[in-house]
Amino acid sequence: MLFSDFYFLMIGATISMVGMLFHGIVGQKKYMGIINQSDLEPLTKSLSLIAWHMFTIFLFGSAFTLAYVAYFPNYSIAAYPIIAVNLFGAFLFIFLGLGKHKHLLKMPGAYLMGITALFAWLGIS
């Protein structure tokens, strides 16, 4: 593994970790504030919270996996699912944003997921 490969993977891991902290703390407070003030049923509000934090957990898993691969490059195959999910997530944000959900293009999700996929790929290629 090249010196730069380690740093590419660690940049991807850092983006995911910072994203996880922001999403899990700041984003959750803002999002759940809006959801809790809505007329949604309590079960829907609870499921919304679960869905929100499933993505937070995904960000943690991405950060952990990319950092692990940076230190143990023999396990670089573990980065491929992280690259794929981040890439498909970025495409989903863009696809929906180009349709009826234009506000998604103003959110950082597509860009951060795309950049994470790029740095992870650079780190293992």
Q: Which residues does each predicted region cover?
A:
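Helix-boundary and loop/linker segments of multi-pass membrane transporters
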Residues: 1-5, 35-43
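Membrane-helix boundary connector in multi-pass membrane proteins
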Residues: 72-73, 91-107, 120-125
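Core segments of alpha-helical transmembrane spans in multipass integral membrane proteins
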Residues: 14, 18-30, 43-71, 83-88
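Small-residue-rich segments of transmembrane alpha-helices in multi-pass membrane proteins
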Residues: 47, 109-124
